[in-house]
């Protein structure tokens, strides 16, 4: 194994047994996390889950009450922020208003007493990387929000940190600019080859940019996986509901058909579902289906085959038609269908009776647990 291959597999950041309390309340408890070289990791969770506290402890802005933080195998638990090879981009960008763009980016290098002959080419390179070299002599107030964001990133990477931390860094941008910056951030991370740790509560941001996502709740990691694993294979109801929209059906196991499939009663209807849980007849489970995984079939009022309901709401969104159904039990189900203007049945009428189906194996089955 060559050095490059080895470094990519070794953790650049390693948190072990980290705990942190504020005013006597523990917000992080016995927290473990490894972040690999060159990885784009997103820490995702609702407000108050502890994600920003984790980021601030990695940066050195908060001190852990217990546990260790390693940076490239060196213990930095007690090392002050300015001595860690880690830089942070904040939500506010924190640019100096009286300095030019060039001076803002050069500030960290001058604080480190880097030779002036080296500063200019490094700052120019960083500005070229974010495609703003032509703005070098402007002041921050003369830039758009997206340009200020890119300057903050250039200032953070000019020091060549081992890890770049981004704390809700896109949340102040409008929707279109935020989408553009998501693409640019990922491209920049690939170009630099350094580790990015991004904190957000925005699921779409996490799914679109990350190599890996950890989902947090109450200071604990609920799931750690790739974006696809997090979305398609949630480990519990919290993760399933937090990442996108999902329908949760209560089901009762009737019998096991084979190693992969069971027959279960869902909404007074027998259905075959894929389930690798150790279950027996009579056990309660949850069957989860995303809105885009469900199919609708318009039926006559007299038809009662399968899971049926009535269209109560419909929303045209350009590419999709989103419908809300009310089942006989009163449960509301969300369905998202690709809009095909040539299909006479796609634009369902309010009050239309429909049957729900889905492709076998697209469902996720979880053990029965209390809704949170």
From Swiss-Prot:
UniProt-listed SMART domains: AAA
The family this protein is said to belong to: Belongs to the ABC transporter superfamily. Spermidine/putrescine importer (TC 3.A.1.11.1) family.
Quaternary structure annotation from Swiss-Prot or TrEMBL: The complex is composed of two ATP-binding proteins (PotA), two transmembrane proteins (PotB and PotC) and a solute-binding protein (PotD).
Subcellular location: Cell inner membrane
Domain (ABC transporter) ranges: 13-243
InterPro entries attached to this UniProt entry: AAA+_ATPase, ABC_SmlMolc_Importer, ABC_transporter-like_ATP-bd, ABC_transporter-like_CS, Mo/tungstate-bd_C_term_dom, P-loop_NTPase, PotA-like, PotA_ATP-bd
Taxonomy of the source species: Bacteria, Pseudomonadati, Pseudomonadota, Gammaproteobacteria, Vibrionales
Record's GO cellular component terms: ATP-binding cassette (ABC) transporter complex
Residues annotated to bind ATP: 45-52
Catalytic activity: ATP + H2O + polyamine-[polyamine-binding protein]Side 1 = ADP + phosphate + polyamineSide 2 + [polyamine-binding protein]Side 1
EC number: 7.6.2.11
Primary residence: membrane
A GO term for molecular function: ATP hydrolysis activity
PROSITE patterns, A to Z: ABC_TRANSPORTER_1 (PS00211), ABC_TRANSPORTER_2 (PS50893), POTA (PS51305)
One Pfam family per UniProt: TOBE_2
Protein name as it appears in the record: Spermidine/putrescine import ATP-binding protein PotA
Function according to Swiss-Prot or TrEMBL: Part of the ABC transporter complex PotABCD involved in spermidine/putrescine import. Responsible for energy coupling to the transport system.
EC top class, as a word: translocase
Gene that produces this protein: potA
Topology within the bilayer: Peripheral membrane protein
Keyword presence, Nucleotide-binding: yes
Domain of life: Bacteria
Keywords for the protein's UniProt record, in alphabetical order: ATP-binding, Cell inner membrane, Cell membrane, Membrane, Nucleotide-binding, Translocase, Transport
